[in-house]
């Protein structure tokens, strides 16, 4: 998210902001620090974009066309779509950073791109929370879950998630704006005062706007509560309940489920905690050294967006649902290579089918000792 002017009239100066996309403006840092950070952001965001589009795209194809429609595949597809859309719009902001934070895409795209990024953030977080709650219910109430857990209900839940994310992301459509800076650049920022855009500079003396500040606080606190604190509390409570239930009933004979649970919680916490913490501190920016924001926000933002390319690994490929298809996918790739290169030492399709069957049986046996 851009670390840019709070609004167009420099009510709080360019050091005070509440950007709603995933690029950080580094004008507050020194020239060398800013340049290094810009290069760092472009490289990291490009890597995340590539891995995210590839990984989430593969998940969408596999879950949609190669797997039976189940509740889990509904979760996985929606989670992958949210992250995929997030990654699709990253090139716009990568270009923004590469052009030294000169916005050339117009006011409408400033609003739309920021809205979509925020919407996908909320959607991903809510879906992870729903997945955690669904798994918890499956362990605590297996009979009820078996009778009421349906694909139709999963689709309805996803619709609610996307609509709720739309509502929480709507401030981007209202407050995002563009303005020319004193350096001759156009910046995309949050105009919480809703005043007519005017060129601003670092030398402008900050004024007081209680309405704009209250809007800033409302957006930031809402984002922290709904996009982090409440989901983290629910996710942690769900998995702690699962661990307690499995330990008490001795349903798990291996430590793998617990490793997955710990990985999910720690990864989610580490990815988003620094980001939300720094933006909460930004509400009282005068009491915090400028270097904390100029250097900390780029790193925190990069870590946060990295979650979008790690989700396929953490929430899909570590689960049992994709084990069978991973073998089939490998078999298809080998057969394709064999057709292109002619006779080779690769095993035949029949041998791969047999091996796939054996691995599937082993997966079923393992699943009986694990709930994830």
UniProtKB/Swiss-Prot annotation:
Cellular location(s): Cell membrane
Chief location of this protein within or outside the cell: membrane
Signal in keyword set: no
Phosphothreonine: modified positions: 341, 371
Cytoplasmic topological intervals: 63-73, 134-152, 245-260, 320-372
GO molecular function terms noted in the UniProt entry: adipokinetic hormone binding; adipokinetic hormone receptor activity; complement receptor activity; G protein-coupled chemoattractant receptor activity; G protein-coupled receptor activity
Transmembrane portions of the chain: 40-62, 74-95, 113-133, 153-174, 224-244, 261-281, 300-319
Positions annotated as glycosylated: 7, 191
Keywords of the record: Cell membrane, Disulfide bond, G-protein coupled receptor, Glycoprotein, Membrane, Phosphoprotein, Receptor, Transducer, Transmembrane, Transmembrane helix
Extracellular-side positions: 1-39, 96-112, 175-223, 282-299
Superkingdom, natural source: Eukaryota
Family recorded in the similarity comment: Belongs to the chemokine-like receptor (CMKLR) family.
Role, per record: Receptor for the chemoattractant adipokine chemerin/RARRES2 and for the omega-3 fatty acid derived molecule resolvin E1. Interaction with RARRES2 initiates activation of G proteins G(i)/G(o) and beta-arrestin pathways inducing cellular responses via second messenger pathways such as intracellular calcium mobilization, phosphorylation of MAP kinases MAPK1/MAPK3 (ERK1/2), TYRO3, MAPK14/P38MAPK and PI3K leading to multifunctional effects, like, reduction of immune responses, enhancing of adipogenesis and angionesis.
Protein name: Chemerin-like receptor 1
Taxonomic lineage of the native organism: Eukaryota, Metazoa, Chordata, Craniata, Vertebrata
């Amino acid at each position: 998210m851009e670390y840019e002017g709070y609004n167009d009239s420099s009510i709080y100066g360019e050091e005070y902001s509440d950007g709603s996309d995933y690029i950080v403006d580094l004008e507050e840092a020194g020239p060398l620090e800013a340049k290094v950070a810009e290069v760092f952001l472009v490289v990291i965001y490009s890597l995340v974009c590539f891995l995210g589009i590839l990984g989430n795209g593969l998940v969408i194809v596999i879950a949609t066309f190669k797997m039976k429609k189940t509740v889990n595949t509904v979760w996985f597809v929606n989670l992958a779509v949210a992250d995929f859309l997030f990654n699709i719009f990253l090139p716009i902001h990568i270009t923004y950073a590469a052009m030294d934070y000169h916005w050339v895409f117009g006011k409408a795209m400033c609003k739309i791109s920021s809205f979509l990024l925020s919407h996908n953030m909320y959607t991903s977080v809510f879906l992870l929370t729903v997945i955690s709650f669904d798994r918890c219910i499956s362990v605590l109430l297996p009979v009820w879950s078996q009778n009421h857990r349906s694909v139709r209900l999963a689709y309805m839940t996803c619709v609610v998630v996307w609509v709720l994310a739309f509502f929480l992301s709507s401030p981007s459509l209202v407050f995002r704006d563009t303005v020319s800076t004193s350096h001759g650049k156009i910046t995309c920022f949050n105009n919480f005062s809703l005043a007519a855009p005017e060129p601003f500079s670092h030398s402008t003396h900050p004024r007081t706007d209680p309405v704009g500040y209250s809007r800033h606080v409302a957006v930031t606190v809402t984002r922290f509560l709904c996009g982090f604190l409440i989901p983290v509390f629910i996710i942690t409570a769900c998995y702690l309940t699962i661990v307690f239930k499995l330990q008490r009933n001795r349903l798990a004979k291996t430590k793998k489920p617990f490793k997955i649970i710990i990985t999910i919680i720690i990864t989610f916490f580490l990815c988003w905690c620094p980001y939300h913490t720094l933006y909460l501190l930004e509400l009282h920016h005068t009491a915090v050294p400028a270097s904390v924001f100029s250097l900390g926000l780029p790193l925190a933002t990069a870590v946060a967006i990295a979650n979008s390319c790690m989700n396929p690994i953490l929430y899909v490929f570590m689960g049992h649902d994709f084990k069978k298809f991973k073998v089939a996918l490998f078999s298809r790739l080998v057969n394709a290579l064999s057709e292109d290169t002619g006779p080779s030492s690769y095993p035949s399709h029949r041998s791969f089918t047999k091996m796939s069957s054996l691995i599937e049986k082993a997966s079923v046996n393992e699943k009986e000792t694990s709930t994830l």
